[in-house]
Amino acid sequence: MNRVINFLNMVALSAMRRSELVGAFFVIAIVFMMITPLPTGLIDVLIAVNICISCLLIMLAMHLPRPLAFSTFPAVLLLTTMFRLALSVSTTRLILLNQDAGHIVEAFGQFVVGGNLAVGLVIFLILTVVNFLVITKGSERVAEVGARFTLDAMPGKQMSIDSDLRANLITVHEARKRRAELNKESQLFGAMDGAMKFVNGDAIASLIIVAINMIGGISIGVLQHNMAAGDALQLYTVLTIGDGLIAQIPALLISVTSGMIITRVPNTEAGVEANIGREIAEQITSQPKAWIIASVAMLGFAALPGMPTGVFITIAIICGAGGLLQLQRAKPKADEQRTAAVAPEMNGKEDLRTFSPSRQFVLQFHPGQDSAQIEALVSEIRKRRNRLVVQYGLTLPSFIIEHVDDIAPDEFRFTVYDVPMLKATFTQSHVAVEARQLEGENLPAAIPGNTDRQEDQWVWLPAEQSGELNPVSSTTLIIERMERALQSCAPQFIGLQETKAILSWLESEQPELAQEMQRVLTLTRFSAVLQRLASECVPLRAIRVIAETLIEHCQHERDTNVLTDYVRIALKSQIYHQYCGAEGLQVWLVTPESEGLLRDGLRQTQTETFFALSNETSQMLVQQLHIAFPVRAPEQAVLLVAQDLRSPLRTLLREEFYHVPVLSFAEISNAAKVKVMGRFDLEDDLEPLDNEHAA
């Protein structure tokens, strides 16, 4: 026995290694079946193989996680149709020549006829009509519509893949994989549309073969074999019905298989691909109320006169019990969901053993807040986030929306890695007004803003008292502060993983440039430069310019800040365009005496250069910055300083004056149009100017 098993294993392995030869042999054998007479014993074997293949295919279709898992099905469908037609030709030849087509054909015919030719013929015709008009026609129509819709949806899906790739949501490898799957899906549904024509033609050919067998067989029996008409009718009808059934039953199974594959809608919401049987069971049992209503309906049918009461009551009990059982099963799930709403460390149901990472972006609201207002605010915040991603080439996480009880009913909170980054007030009755607009005003109803630094310049007023003070609604203020918060935390999300994704994109578009860059620059230094650029709101989209600049300077310069300055100079056109207004670039300068004070306060360590200014100088600088760079300025202005002061000055202003761009003279081209707004004088008051100068 072991020798037989080992021999079969060797044959199977050899067939798998030479699968192309096996396929070619199978096709040639089908052709020879149509022209060469076969013995009845071999016909029985081939009929059994045909039925087995049909059963195997329908079971395979039920366990497929998605249609693409059986992308060769159109070719298999063509081969099985050819095999079935060749088998019908062989059995027809045996019926007409020998009045014998093997044991399986005769057994099928005798079983269905059951002593009554008319009943057997009617049953056979019903099976044929069901296969041809219902299953085959329906599958053909679904294949046609599926192919059309798949082709129509291809451009949108391709654009979605390209958009995800540009936003660094997926890698280049993942994008190629998705494009390949999309192409494979379109080819599958297109091939299925054509393959269903074979199934339709096979059903029509089966009807014609049945008519030929019956009419030709009776004629041959009466005219050539001198049989009585009744005997010929009995013999050839049984054989014809048997032959038709051994063709129609596999055809019916394969038609159902085609319909199941075409109509398959994979459900991957949970991230696990399930077979169709499991999905049907889960979805049917997902609504317990439907089972209970069906049970009541069955009881109604049982009450009708003349109905089999016991049958309907039994079915009603089964449906009702199923519905109640599902309700009991759904209750623990609801409890688990309510428990899951509580922090895992507070539910007291289990000992936590898994690693729980910090959540990146969380928007927190009070449960009692207006859902419509929350939805509108979140939508606008998402628009600002997406604009930053597109405009600056950033990789920002998605938002998690959470309702918590530990904040006031009129508050909003934004956390980054579970650390509060922004806290603001939701209010309809008050509006925000800049504090400098209230100088000299006596408004006792004014409420100071939050202690967050960006909101030190704001106070809250009742809406009816705002008058002509240019008030801002709480929603608008939250959105503006959220945009600044997103910009300030963007460098945290340009780590090694995100930098590797950018480098992978560069490898696909500029392979030589990417190879040279990896040779001269480590991934860590590249990431550090990108973080510095993002911290100063410099767009990262011109990645080719950034890469070429780093390749040019990184071998003789080790300081990341200096490398960043080189990149900024290379991106001077992008930076100028970013801050340029209708009248050109509005700049504030620093007087030479003030530059001297700043240079005197420079201190340098092995890792950084920073300012150590006196209290008087720091207060004067902060005071003049508040005047020159209000948070809600009509046009964006920049602070223009010498190259050696730019980086440490930007670091000094990073916390309180994040919205103030600091540029160096080297980052302004000779053709740039510059309007000087005034000069910072750290020994005197701010000096506003009205003159225009071209740099």
Curated annotation (Swiss-Prot):
Membrane topology per record: Multi-pass membrane protein
Record's subcellular location: Cell inner membrane
One annotated GO biological process: protein secretion
PROSITE patterns, per the entry: FHIPEP (PS00994)
Transmembrane annotation, as ranges: 21-38, 45-61, 68-92, 111-135, 203-223, 244-262, 311-327
Gene3D superfamilies: FHIPEP family, domain 1, FHIPEP family, domain 3, FHIPEP family, domain 4
Cellular component annotations (GO), alphabetically ordered: plasma membrane
Keyword Transmembrane on entry: yes
The UniProt record lists the keyword Glycoprotein: no
InterPro entries: FHIPEP_1, FHIPEP_3, FHIPEP_4, FHIPEP_CS, T3SS_FHIPEP, T3SS_HrcV
The entry's keywords: Cell inner membrane, Cell membrane, Hypersensitive response elicitation, Membrane, Protein transport, Transmembrane, Transmembrane helix, Transport
Source organism, top-level taxon: Bacteria
Family classification: Belongs to the FHIPEP (flagella/HR/invasion proteins export pore) family.
Free-text function comment from the UniProt entry: Involved in the secretion of harpin-pss; a proteinaceous elicitor of the hypersensitivity response in plants.
Protein name: Hypersensitivity response secretion protein HrpI
